[in-house]
Amino acid sequence: MNFIKEFREFAMRGNVVDMAVGVIIGSAFGKIVSSLVSDIFMPVLGILTGGIDFKDMKFVLAQAQGDVPAVTLNYGLFIQNVIDFIIIAFAIFMMIKVINKVRKPEEKKPVPKAETLLTEIRDLLKNK
């Protein structure tokens, strides 16, 4: 019973719940960006590059033989995934910049009175 109680306390901490929400939102955001790249950007890029479909760009290492499919290096899909990553990384970078601007800077803690007095005493002793 103690184990369940400890787990519940751990799971309900603010950091864990915030992280879980962030992972879910990040996953959904990733799907949106992937769709944006594959359904909007890549077709336009394909038209600009002469009608090339990046999904079909590949090197054939071994031809298909009977029921065995061809062995390929799908570099077109890799290019598409790199573009996905760049867009996601840029969007996260921009969100962090906005969050850091909005976040209030930490207030400087006042110097404890004892430390101030000791500093003054030290300075007075130096001047003697």
Swiss-Prot record:
Cited InterPro entries: Mechanosensitive_channel_CS (IPR019823), MS_channel (IPR001185), MSC/AndL (IPR037673), MscL_channel (IPR036019)
Q: Does the keyword Ion transport apply?
A: yes
Q: Which UniProt keywords apply?
A: Cell inner membrane, Cell membrane, Ion channel, Ion transport, Membrane, Transmembrane, Transmembrane helix, Transport
Origin superkingdom: Bacteria
GO terms (molecular function) for this protein are: mechanosensitive monoatomic ion channel activity
Per UniProt, subcellular location reads as: Cell inner membrane
Q: PROSITE patterns given for it? A: MSCL (PS01327)
The membrane-topology field of this record reads:
Multi-pass membrane protein
**Cellular component GO terms, alphabetical:** plasma membrane
What transmembrane ranges does the database entry give?
A: 10-30, 76-96
Per the similarity annotation, which family is this?
Belongs to the MscL family.
Report the protein's function. Channel that opens in response to stretch forces in the membrane lipid bilayer. May participate in the regulation of osmotic pressure changes within the cell.
User: Quaternary state and partners of this protein?
Assistant: Homopentamer.
Q: Which NCBIfam families match?
A: mscL, PRK00567.1-4
User: What is the name listed in the Swiss-Prot or TrEMBL entry for this protein?
Assistant: Large-conductance mechanosensitive channel
What is the species listed in this Swiss-Prot or TrEMBL entry? Answer: Haemophilus influenzae (strain PittEE)
The organism's lineage is: Bacteria, Pseudomonadati, Pseudomonadota, Gammaproteobacteria, Pasteurellales
Q: Which gene encodes it?
A: mscL
